[in-house]
């Protein structure tokens, strides 16, 4: 079987971290004997420069036909038109592909716990995933308005929107340590009451998964004081936005964190959570690990290459433990040097 992969290098450091990652993918495919077809398209700010839009119809159609999308990074101060920003392309892409679930792993190995801003004995052994609902909730609720003396936002969820994200989280927990924490604000919000009810209903289909309901304020505290207690966390859009950013600092650098966006079926999108960092673009300083770990997610979730994903993650973590890192992690290696060392593992 041959997989179709679309590469979207994007802006800033995106092209340099993605190009090295694609070279790695080629070596990995040769070792693990799978085939893929690769297409690359301009996306984000660079697409605005070339075509006047962050997402062309050609790029969108290519993404719709793909098994997986690898995205570098988008955005930057160059593109200031509020009606035509690079980020609009990503929002349209997510909506067009119905990517309603955002998956963010947070992992801290023993040898990397010193990088965290938290105490080593607190973070060592952290291995959690936050599953955030991405396309509903208060960010998309209607009515919504701002007037001179008042403003309104609407928080609405349907049972179908809740169930589909909850099932993704249950399936993920079932493959991991079988612990699911559902985060809500059930003591105040009506939508959270429905959320908790749906979680309890779906739980009947996953008898082996232990479910714990937690209020969002308590979860935000426990993420910092006892992150190792969590396996899979599932929550709605606003809460997930905040909690996933909170969790992303636990490993010690935004440059370490991968992410994936899932729909019910079809194309999935993989990208590091960091921005385009235009201040260091083309300076060979960017931390590539978030992008490389996003490739590992892609190998596991879209290309059915679990062994390859495990090996790639192990190599990255061994580099971090031995201080083969870029400057943001206290190392002295340049981006190109990290990729050279990574590729040597497959030669």
UniProtKB/Swiss-Prot annotation:
Major localization listed first in the record, in broad terms: cytoplasm
**Keyword presence, Magnesium:** yes
Relay the cofactor remark from the entry. Answer: Binds 1 Mg(2+) or Mn(2+) ion per subunit.
This protein's GO cellular component annotations are: cytosol
Name of the top EC class for this enzyme: oxidoreductase
Q: Which family does it belong to?
A: Belongs to the isocitrate and isopropylmalate dehydrogenases family. LeuB type 1 subfamily.
Please state what the protein is called.
Answer: 3-isopropylmalate dehydrogenase
Query: Taxonomy-wise, where does this protein's organism fall, top ranks first?
Result: Bacteria, Bacillati, Bacillota, Bacilli, Bacillales
